[in-house]
Structures are given as C-alpha cells and as structure tokens.
C-alpha cells in the first residue's frame, strides 16, 4: 500500500492499543543471558541478507518503530530476557525519542544496536538522489544525537527496495552494508499471534537475519513463545555489531 496509507494505518492501530499492552510485555518469557560472541569479522561491502558461517547465531532485526508502546515493550523485553537485537530506526517516529531513556542504557551496553532505516520510510527509488541523501543523513544525525551512534555501516532501505545509485549515496555516508533479511515474523500487517509464532518457527534458524517490526501490538503478546522457541533450538541472539566489527 502507499507509504502514507501504511503510516496512517499503523498510527491508528497503535493509538488504540496503548492500554492493552501496558501490562508486563515479557510475561511468560524465559530469562536467558546470552554470551557475547567472540571473534568478529569485517562487515561486507554490499548486500547482507544472512549471517556468515555455520554457527547457532540468530540476528533479530526490528524495523520502523511506529508505536510508542510497542517500542517500549521491546525495551522491556530486552531488559527482562537479555535478548540481543538490532533496531532499524525511522527517526521521524516519536517512539525513539519517547523511549530513549529506556533504550540508551541497552545501546550503551551493546545489548541493543541502532541502525539506519531512513528518516521517514519512503520508497527511495521514487525520490531524487538528493532527497535520498537527506533521508539517510537526517536519520544519522538523529541517531547520533539521541543514542550516540549513527549505526554505520548498516543501512536497511525501506521495503528492501534499493539500486546501485541508492547504495552509492548510502555508502558515501558510511553505510556500506545494505542489510536485508533471510526470514520474517510476518508482522508488517495485522496478524494473529498464532500466525506470528508459526512464521517465527520457520524463520528462527541458525545464521538467519530475521525481520520484525515495532509497529503493531500483536508481537508483544508473543514474547514468551518466541523466547522459548529460541531457547529450544539453542540459538544465540546477536546484534550485527556482535558479528561484524
């Protein structure tokens, strides 16, 4: 659907569920303290869609942040379970400013990573390159000012849409690794909990980069099931910085 319609839908849904997810979001989750991986490798120049090697790592990546309470629930989930993950942030969403006090300690500790997903989530291939540059640069400035990092070299183009010109503009700002994904929880549109858990069961495999979103509340009701799934498969959650350095 068009970007403006998508954002309007997400905000409307998020506004109606603030009270519903004010309860402890990680109820039922198994608390696991992940060991930080040893021995990082250089990040690839170009497209990254899967972690290298044959280990047991799982890179959870969380996009957008259209909902203030859902971003807050993710922060609480990370604190409660020790899960390591990477946020791909749209700085235009107020959730990243509202929840900065909760997230900044997790970022400073390295448990949570921030990366660049553009300022406002447009289709970059429909814009002039000067506008693409502004989208990336404005978001980088926001990340530095709010979280002390610009997330380079990891950049995720909205909708996964990019081309050589977009990649060059991103690389000129230090974002040399276009980060896509190899599996998805399937929560970009409204789904029930059973569907999200079923999608996760397919996606949560060794060395996968998994896409999820901090937009709709249903994902916050699945935290316990998702954490149990990770533990049952002996997977180790990692940020991208845990793997590449």
Language-model region placement:
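Acidic-and-aromatic substrate-binding clefts and catalytic sites of carbohydrate-active enzymes
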Residues: 65-69, 90-99, 122-127, 156-162, ...
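N-terminal pre-catalytic segment of deacetylase/amide-hydrolase enzymes
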Residues: 1-60, 67-74, 80, 100-104, ...
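Active-site beta->alpha N-cap acidic-glycine motif
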Residues: 33-116, 120-123, 131, 135, ...
């Amino acid at each position: 659907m068009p970007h403006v319609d998508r954002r309007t839908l997400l905000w409307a849904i998020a506004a109606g569920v603030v009270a519903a997810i004010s309860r402890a979001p990680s109820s039922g989750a198994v608390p696991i303290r992940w060991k930080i991986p040893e021995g990082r490798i250089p990040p690839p120049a170009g497209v990254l869609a899967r972690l290298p090697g044959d280990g047991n790592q799982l890179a959870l990546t969380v996009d957008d942040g259209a909902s203030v309470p859902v971003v807050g629930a993710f922060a609480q989930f990370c604190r409660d379970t020790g899960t390591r993950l990477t946020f791909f942030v749209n700085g235009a969403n107020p959730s990243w400013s509202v929840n900065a006090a909760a997230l900044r300690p997790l970022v400073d500790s390295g448990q949570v990573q921030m990366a660049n997903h553009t300022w406002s989530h447009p289709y970059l291939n429909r814009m002039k390159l000067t506008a693409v540059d502004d989208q990336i640069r404005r978001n980088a400035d926001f990340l530095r000012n709010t979280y002390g990092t610009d997330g380079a070299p990891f950049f995720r183009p909205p909708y996964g849409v990019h081309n050589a010109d977009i990649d060059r503009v991103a690389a000129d700002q230090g974002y040399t690794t276009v980060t896509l994904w190899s599996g998805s929880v399937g929560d970009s549109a409204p789904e029930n909990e059973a569907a999200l858990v079923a999608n996760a069961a397919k996606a949560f495999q060794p060395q996968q980069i998994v896409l999820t979103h901090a937009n709709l509340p249903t994902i916050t009701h699945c935290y316990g099931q998702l954490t149990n799934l990770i533990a049952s498969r002996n997977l180790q959650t990692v940020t991208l910085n845990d793997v590449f350095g």
